[in-house]
């Protein structure tokens, strides 16, 4: 919580110094349109992420059961951990900095820079340094997702949309299923984990298809939205 407050304060100071603006550039005023569109993006991401786990159950014989330690505290902590982490990353990578980059460099360059920063941030957080293949895979997915999230903000000038996409994926991966860093999950994996040999097609359907589907479906959903910024149309 303290980190969020500090980041918001720094964002306000930055926009105030650069163009005497305020945090309204983040597009956080709630409207029915933003709620409906955000809900659609959230559900698309959550459904795509869930599909990956369902294929693991079907093809890899993995089993997940309700966490025996579940209680109200675990649920609250698990949800809040994901809300705060996603919000922090959105403010850092798609907040005032992205808004100013759009005005300075145009949308295409701003989106590209934001995506690179997002990918590098996940390199630091995922502990993959020293493993070239893992570094490549993490960078490829997070860079592609970073492009989508930055594009969502650049097109709509609202953090609701990148937040909804990002949170929809993370809440399934990190809270519903036990693949996140926080440890407070609704489901846990039954042990021992089965050792199953699958084809390359099945492997790709488990680990690659859900990610690609989330990026592609959300991209087209965002693309259908009315652009909020008429200047620097090169990234529309």
PLM regions and their residue ranges:
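Small-polar-interrupted transmembrane alpha-helices in polytopic inner-membrane proteins
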Residues: 82, 86, 107-123, 142-143
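C-terminal membrane module of polytopic membrane proteins
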Residues: 171-236
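Hydrophobic cores of alpha-helical transmembrane segments in multi-pass inner/ER membrane proteins
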Residues: 6-14, 45-46, 81-87, 146, ...
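Alpha-helical transmembrane segments in multi-pass membrane proteins
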Residues: 1-15, 36-43, 72, 76-77, ...
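Aromatic-anchored segments of alpha-helical transmembrane domains
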Residues: 46-54, 115-125, 167-179
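Juxtamembrane helix-loop-helix connectors linking adjacent transmembrane helices
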Residues: 23-91, 98, 102-104
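Functionally important transmembrane alpha-helices
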Residues: 137-193
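Membrane-interface helix/loop boundary segments of multi-pass membrane proteins
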Residues: 91-113, 154-158
């Amino acid at each position: 919580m303290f980190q969020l407050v500090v980041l918001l304060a720094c964002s306000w100071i930055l926009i105030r110094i650069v163009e005497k603006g305020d945090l309204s550039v983040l597009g956080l005023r709630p409207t029915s349109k933003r709620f409906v569109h955000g809900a659609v993006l959230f559900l698309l991401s959550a459904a795509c992420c869930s599909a990956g786990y369902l294929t693991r159950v079907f093809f890899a014989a993995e089993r997940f059961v309700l966490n025996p330690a579940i209680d109200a505290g675990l649920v609250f902590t698990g949800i809040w951990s994901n809300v705060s982490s996603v919000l922090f990353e959105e403010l850092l990578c798609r907040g005032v900095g992205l808004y100013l980059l759009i005005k300075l460099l145009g949308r295409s360059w701003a989106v590209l820079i934001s995506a690179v920063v997002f990918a590098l941030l996940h390199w630091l957080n995922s502990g993959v340094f020293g493993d070239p293949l893992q570094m490549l895979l993490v960078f490829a997915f997070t860079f592609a997702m970073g492009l989508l999230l930055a594009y969502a903000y650049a097109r709509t000038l609202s953090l609701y949309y990148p937040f909804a996409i990002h949170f929809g994926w993370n809440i399934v991966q990190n809270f519903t299923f036990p693949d996140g860093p926080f440890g407070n999950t609704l489901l846990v994996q039954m042990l021992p984990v089965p050792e199953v040999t699958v084809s390359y097609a099945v492997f790709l359907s488990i680990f690659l298809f859900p990610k690609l589907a989330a990026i592609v479906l959300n991209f087209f959903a965002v693309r259908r939205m009315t652009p909020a910024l008429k200047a620097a149309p090169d990234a529309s």
